[in-house]
From Swiss-Prot:
Predominant place of localization: cytoplasm
Listed name of the protein: ATP phosphoribosyltransferase
CDD domains in the cross-refs: PBP2_HisGs
GO molecular-function term, one example from the UniProt record: ATP phosphoribosyltransferase activity
Subcellular location: Cytoplasm
EC id: 2.4.2.17
Signal peptide (from-to): none
GO cellular component, one term: cytoplasm
Role according to the record: Catalyzes the condensation of ATP and 5-phosphoribose 1-diphosphate to form N'-(5'-phosphoribosyl)-ATP (PR-ATP). Has a crucial role in the pathway because the rate of histidine biosynthesis seems to be controlled primarily by regulation of HisG enzymatic activity.
Domain comment quoted from the record: Lacks the C-terminal regulatory region which is replaced by HisZ.
Gene3D superfamilies per record: Periplasmic binding protein-like II
Subunit annotation: Heteromultimer composed of HisG and HisZ subunits.
Pathway recorded for this protein: Amino-acid biosynthesis; L-histidine biosynthesis; L-histidine from 5-phospho-alpha-D-ribose 1-diphosphate: step 1/9
Length: 211
């Protein structure tokens, strides 16, 4: 039976394709970097390339059997599918960052800019703080630099962008990596094929992931 997989475009795609190829899946057409978004060249595996926030949408509607997406999206959106495998790629961290003069212990109500309002809200609730969340798409780093927000919650891999913009990390919230998520119904209907894929990827994925 054919498995249909939603793969996150961009950095995740670039990092995961070598793993898929090493697991014996034909990825040449995707690696050719055309403008195609649907790939059905391998009779056993069909792929669609989508933006990260859309992976769970396709998965939840049963359009695809499997989604390959960052755990940041899983944590932010929430999901009702099976998170089956950490691929140990795309490692980065959720962080709280701001300018050097920011005081995280300050008692006044803080303004926090982020692409991840749910995760940010959860973090500050655990800290016992009531904050105002400003959702931003794009360069979140600008928010504390322009005075629009006191701090940001974002993901970082190396911290280079933060350093270049003179921002300091005040807390690490969680680690992030790329995960393989399976539709509940697909796991019942295509159990053998899905577990064969997972076993193949377990053999070729990085065993230890580091930042």
């Amino acid at each position: 039976m054919t498995l249909t997989i939603a793969l996150t475009k961009g950095r995740t795609e670039t990092q995961v394709l070598p793993l898929l190829a090493a697991a014996g899946i034909h990825c040449e057409a995707i690696q050719a970097k055309s403008r195609r978004l649907i790939f059905a060249d391998d009779p056993s595996f069909h792929f669609i390339l989508v933006k990260a926030p859309e992976v769970l949408t396709y998965l939840n509607h049963g359009t695809v059997d499997i989604g390959i997406v960052g755990s940041d999206i899983l944590a932010e959106q929430g999901h009702r599918q099976f998170d089956m495998l950490d691929l140990n790629t795309g490692r980065c961290r959720f962080i709280l960052a701001s300018t050097a003069d920011f005081d995280p212990k300050q008692t006044k109500r803080k303004l926090i800019a982020t692409k991840y309002p749910h995760i940010a809200q959860q973090y500050f609730q655990k800290q016992g703080e009531d904050v105002e969340i400003i959702k931003i798409e794009g360069s979140v780093e600008l928010a504390p630099l322009t005075g629009m927000a006191d701090a940001i919650v974002d993901i970082t891999e190396t911290g280079t962008t933060l350093r270049e913009n003179h921002l300091k990390v005040f807390a690490e919230l969680a680690s992030v990596s790329t995960h393989l998520v399976v539709n509940r119904l697909a796991l019942k209907q295509k159990r053998t094929e899905i577990y064969q894929l997972i076993q193949s990827l377990q053999k070729v994925r990085p065993q230890e992931a580091s930042l």
